[in-house]
C-alpha cells in the first residue's frame, strides 16, 4: 500500500467532507462527528451517482441523490435504497494532513 495526502486536517471540521481525486481515484474524504477521518469511493452503489455533497451524519455519509446511507469506516450499507456497500480506504492524520492508503 502507498499513502497519499488527501486533505489538510484543518480543512475538515467534524461533520464535513470533501471530494478529492487521489492517484486517479475519486474519493470522499470525511471527518466524522467524533473527529475521526475516513475516505470512501465517491460513488453510491445504488445508482452509481457521486456522493459529493452528501451529509456526514455521525460516522456515516448520506447520498445526496436518493438518501442511501453508508458507514464511513467500513463502507457498509446502513440505509436503503442501496443494497451493496462502497469501498472504504484506511486513513490517518499525521502532521496536519489526512493520508489515505491505496493499493
Describe the residue ranges of each PLM region.
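N-terminal pre-ligand scaffold of iron-sulfur
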Residues: 1-58, 71-72, 76, 85-103
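Short cysteine clusters
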Residues: 44, 63-66
Amino acid at each position: 500500500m502507498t499513502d497519499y495526502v488527501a486533505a489538510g486536517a484543518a480543512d475538515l471540521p467534524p461533520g464535513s467532507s470533501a471530494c478529492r481525486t487521489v492517484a486517479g481515484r475519486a474519493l470522499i474524504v470525511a471527518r466524522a462527528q467524533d473527529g475521526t477521518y475516513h475516505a470512501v469511493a465517491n460513488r453510491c452503489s445504488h445508482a452509481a451517482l457521486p456522493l459529493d455533497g452528501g451529509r456526514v451524519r455521525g460516522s456515516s455519509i448520506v447520498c445526496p441523490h436518493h438518501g442511501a446511507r453508508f458507514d464511513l469506516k467500513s463502507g457498509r450499507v446502513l440505509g436503503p435504497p442501496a443494497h451493496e456497500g462502497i469501498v472504504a480506504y484506511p486513513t490517518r492524520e499525521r502532521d496536519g494532513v489526512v493520508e489515505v492508503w491505496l493499493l
